[in-house]
Amino acid sequence: MFKKLFLPVGILIAVIWSLAAPAAGLFCKEYIGTPAMIVAIFLVSGMQVKFNELKFDRKFVLALIFGSGFTLVGLSFCGWLTLNWMNWDKALLAGLLVMLAAPPTLSSGIVMTNQSNGNMMLSIAITVFYNLIAIVTLPLVLGFLLNAAAAGNVDSWKMFKQLILTVMLPLFIGYGIKKYIMKSFYHKLIDYIPLTATIMLSLAFFAAARESILAIPIVTVLVVLFAALIFHIFSMAALWFISKVLRMSVADTKAMVFCGASKSATMALAMVAIAGLGSSAAAVPCLLFYALQLFLDAVLANYARRF
């Protein structure tokens, strides 16, 4: 229970702390740096990934193709088409688009699948491969959408190179370290490093964007939460429909829905930094979306255990 609550409670404390006293967050941003925190997150995430447990079959390949196509590309364009005509603050629009384009979380999606009695192995496969595919889709999708929405001047090639250096390489290096060096003495406390780094990222982003965030009306926050709710439910419904078309089992469907529809706040915050939006309010929709997702998925996962 402590580990499950560590990230959401930690992010909540970080947000309140950074808005009340931004000095700690500004210190993290200035002297530790967001790239170092991102590398730490994915270095340890690589140690947690279990590539050897993945199983390939026809349904997995089809789920990978159609599921990733929707959640990594289609959902983002749906969000852009829906929100672009509204008079949104550009930073908030950018943050929501980043979250919609993000791959699944590296942990909570699997936890929710397991909680719902879904196919945990398929959820692991979806998590690993969606995150790898996202290395390619994120710079392409966000490079187009953020520029088209005038929400940021994004260089797709630069973004791709930074994703390789700060996400993909640390992920595989971490996997190699766990497999060949720390195989017998990996301590579970190491699992808290990416969680702590994500909290520090939140602290840094909210401290840097404090003035912009405090200027956001409460009504706008509620609108962002409502938009996040609509898009998350839409994503889960679409993935449920895809799984039915592919005639997947109930357990596989649960993995598709709970894992495929989950969005990684860690990756979203990393993308906010890489896209040069770290000093704006772009992190706000990411964290609001993440908090709403955690609550809604926990409720639905417990309900889904009946089926």
Where are these regions (language model features)?
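Alpha-helical transmembrane segments of multi-pass small-molecule/ion transporters
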Residues: M1-F307
